[in-house]
């Protein structure tokens, strides 16, 4: 049984039902029927469409989704036709030919031929009408892709955590599909992971890894905390040790983990500073109760929840025509948490562009 689900939003194209994945290429031959879905952006879509035109095809749309679907479909047709003619000419009865084609169809070769000219980041999944399945990842590893293989099932997802949660497994059981590799599964359940092209220099997308990924992934969580902690020296220099008159906060919600990392980094800095001050006073004989109170009880980093955002409201994926209205009321502030003499330090993890409606808000 093959099940698929696609929850990614479109980065281009139209906001209508017809633009949703998966895309289908139907025929009355199971081994020529194709379904494609995934997380990808091709950087050379015009060139790929021109290649189809020079081949004699007539692309109806200029999207990379159509390009991927039609390119794989073309090489699938070629492989199917070659097998059909060979089997027909060998004298095999017509009703037996579809099953023979299905068993002989080489998914790896089809994908290898299809992806020769692709340039971009992609994690693409697809299925053929006979029950064969494939999943491939770009040679730079720009888009994330993970898989889980057990005795009962094979599952694939962009991120590690959904597989861990749904199938109740440990993180070590979920593997990352290497760049330039594909997972192919035949209809009979046999499967393989093979290279379909040459791996290139690793270049994972920071948007995918830091902003868009689920924050409860163990690796992503550590990376986000480290990202916040790395800001510690800059914050210390800008505040000049005035922690008692500073409030640390974050925006948007995805910045929360990095915010914890920043607070942790600032507290480690403060502990080291206090330790050094106390040691120096102890050696000089100037350690007294007032100094202990000043060093231990005062000037520690203070965190505040300043910006409140309705987590159900996604301004980033809202269409431009309604974004201004949504942004104007999706955020609110905590009143009275910051005084007129306080310095507000806001950790902003927005890796996307700030639209004009956001600036106005």
Tell what function each PLM region has.
Residues 232, 236-240, 253, 263-271, ...:
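Hydrophobic alpha-helix feature that most strongly marks membrane-spanning transmembrane helices
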Residues 52, 140-142, 150-152, 262-269, ...:
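Short secondary-structure boundary/capping segments
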Residues 135-138, 146-147, 256-263, 355:
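A short acidic (Asp/Glu
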Residues 14, 264-344:
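Short, glycine/charge-rich flexible loops or terminal/linker lids adjacent to PRPP-binding catalytic cores
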Residues 57, 61, 65-90, 259-288, ...:
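Internal, charge-rich low-complexity segments
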Residues 2-5, 349-360:
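Residue-level detector of conserved catalytic or cofactor/ligand-binding positions
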Residues 255, 343-349:
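C-terminal substrate/ligand-recognition segments
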Residues 3-178, 184-247, 251-252, 337-340:
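Conserved short alpha-helical segments that host acidic/polar catalytic motifs at enzyme active sites
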């Amino acid at each position: 049984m093959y099940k698929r689900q696609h929850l990614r939003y479109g980065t281009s194209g139209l906001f209508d039902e017809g633009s949703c994945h998966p895309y289908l290429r139907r025929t009355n031959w199971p081994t020529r029927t194709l379904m494609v879905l995934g997380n990808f952006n091709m950087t050379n879509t015009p060139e790929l469409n021109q290649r189809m035109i020079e081949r004699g095809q007539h692309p109806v749309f200029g999207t990379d989704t159509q390009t991927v679907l039609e390119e794989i479909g073309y090489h699938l047709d070629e492989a199917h036709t070659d097998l059909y003619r060979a089997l027909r000419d060998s004298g095999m009865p017509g009703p037996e030919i579809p099953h023979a084609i299905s068993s002989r169809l080489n998914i790896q070769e089809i994908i290898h031929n299809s992806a020769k000219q692709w340039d971009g980041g992609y994690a693409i999944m697809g299925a053929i009408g006979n029950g064969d399945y494939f999943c491939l990842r770009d040679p730079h590893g720009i888009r994330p892709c993970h898989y889980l293989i057990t005795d009962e099932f094979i599952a694939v997802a962009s991120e590690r955590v959904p597989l861990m949660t749904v199938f109740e497994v440990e993180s070590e059981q979920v593997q990352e599909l290497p760049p330039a590799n594909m997972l192919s599964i035949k209809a009979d359940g046999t499967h393989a992971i093979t290279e379909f092209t040459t791996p290139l220099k690793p270049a994972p997308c920071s948007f995918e890894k830091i902003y868009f990924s689920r924050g409860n992934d163990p690796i992503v969580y550590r990376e986000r905390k480290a990202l916040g902690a790395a800001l510690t020296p800059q914050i210390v220099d800008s505040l000049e040790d005035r922690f008692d008159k500073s409030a640390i906060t974050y925006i948007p919600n995805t910045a929360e983990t990095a915010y914890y990392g920043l607070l942790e980094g600032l507290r480690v800095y403060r502990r080291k500073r206090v330790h050094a001050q106390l040691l120096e006073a102890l050696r000089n004989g100037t350690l007294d109760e007032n100094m202990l109170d000043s060093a231990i009880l005062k000037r520690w980093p203070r965190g505040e929840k300043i910006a409140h955002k309705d987590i159900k409201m996604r301004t980033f994926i809202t269409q431009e025509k309604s974004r201004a209205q949504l942004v104007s009321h999706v955020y609110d502030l905590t009143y009275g948490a910051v005084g007129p003499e306080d310095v507000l330090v806001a950790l902003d993890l927005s890796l996307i562009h700030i639209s004009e409606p956001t600036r106005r808000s």
